[in-house]
Amino acid sequence: FFFFKAHKARVGARTSFLTEMERGSRDHHRDHRDHREHRETREPPTLAFHMKSWKTINKSLKAFAKLLKENATVTFTPQPSIIIQSAKNHLVQKLTIQAECLFLSDTDRFLTKTINNHIPLFESFMNIISNPEVTKMYIQHDSDLYTRVLVTASDTCTQASVPCVHGQEVVRDTGRSPLRIDLDHSTVSDVLKWLSPVTKTKRSGKSDALMAHIIVQVNPPTIKFVTEMNELEFSNSNKVIFYDVKNMRFNLSAKNLQQALSMCAVIKTSCSLRTVAAKDCKLILTSKSTLLTVEAFLTQEQLKEESRFERMGKQDDGKGDRSHKNEDGSALASKQEMQYEITNYMVPAKNGTAGSSLFNEKEDSESDDSMHFDYSSNPNPKRQRCVV
């Protein structure tokens, strides 16, 4: 009797244990299913602007929209940041919108994505973020093949799925430089005014590639901007500060130098002039504010014939560092500078006019004049020396 009673108790305990296991397994599968359904229904990771911060940089973004047109791409990163990059021959321009201006809902699931600046319906991404009528804008990552852009403006709410661009390189500064010179905003404006008549001459067809040359000398620390028309010289002062100096010369397109300085002048802070030893980048101009960072990477142009700058450079070599002549003189002129290749993903406008846009806001001017600083003084003096 006692044997059968004990056996019955053991069977009951085993049955109870199996029931608990089955119940636990069912609960686990149910929880897993609920988690999967929640994951499938929750919102994709979303990048958005802090609208209060965005309003403070809206005018700057409007100016950048005019300067960043050629071969422009937009990269969204999980830092978060938005990088707008534009490329032309011997010049790469880069605008970074910092994390202080952005909000990201899920940093773990948001992957770096790159799209073309041209967006159907909106005309361009820069047009969206520089339009004062925008009240909300979201960038959502729910596919590796495209990026979803949602825009709200007054009584309009629109979204577009933009194909991603793969294999696109973001130009980055190595941070190591044998040269660093800081120019304050007023000095940058002075150089732009000085360059203005030189770049305007190009429209008359007198020259295919008008050059601007930069000469840096160690003793005493000076930086010269030289063209065929005249030259501008700055020495060490509270407006031009020499941190690291090396005898160097740069042969640049005057138009490229003007556009790079114009980018730096927009945010009205000091401009840092640096260089790197890599073949594909010789000169870097950088300006930073709390919310924006501007970088311009310029590579040297090849000189077709000996210019006044080259003749003057030969005279300066007797006073300066002769080893630098072998480094940056004829050796560079005989080599083809490597170039950052950023493919043109821009969609050409029909009949030479801008395509239709959701906002369709008429710009003040679409000509190059809208990017130039006014220049009214007489450039007759062949040499100008600026010392503060």
Curated annotation (Swiss-Prot):
GO molecular function, one term: DNA polymerase processivity factor activity
Bias (Basic residues) ranges: 26-36
Highest taxon of the lineage: Viruses
UniProt xrefs under SUPFAM superfamilies: DNA clamp
Keywords: DNA replication, DNA-binding, Phosphoprotein
Start-end of Basic and acidic residues biased regions: 306-328
InterPro entries per record: DNA_clamp_sf (IPR046938), Herpes_PAP (IPR004997)
Pfam families (alphabetical): Herpes_PAP (PF03325)
Gene Ontology BP annotations: DNA replication; viral genome replication
Region ranges (Disordered): 20-44, 306-388
Disulfide pattern: none
Function: Accessory subunit of the DNA polymerase that acts to increase the processivity of polymerization.
Family membership: Belongs to the herpesviridae polymerase accessory protein family.
Protein name: DNA polymerase processivity factor
Organism ancestry: Viruses, Duplodnaviria, Heunggongvirae, Peploviricota, Herviviricetes
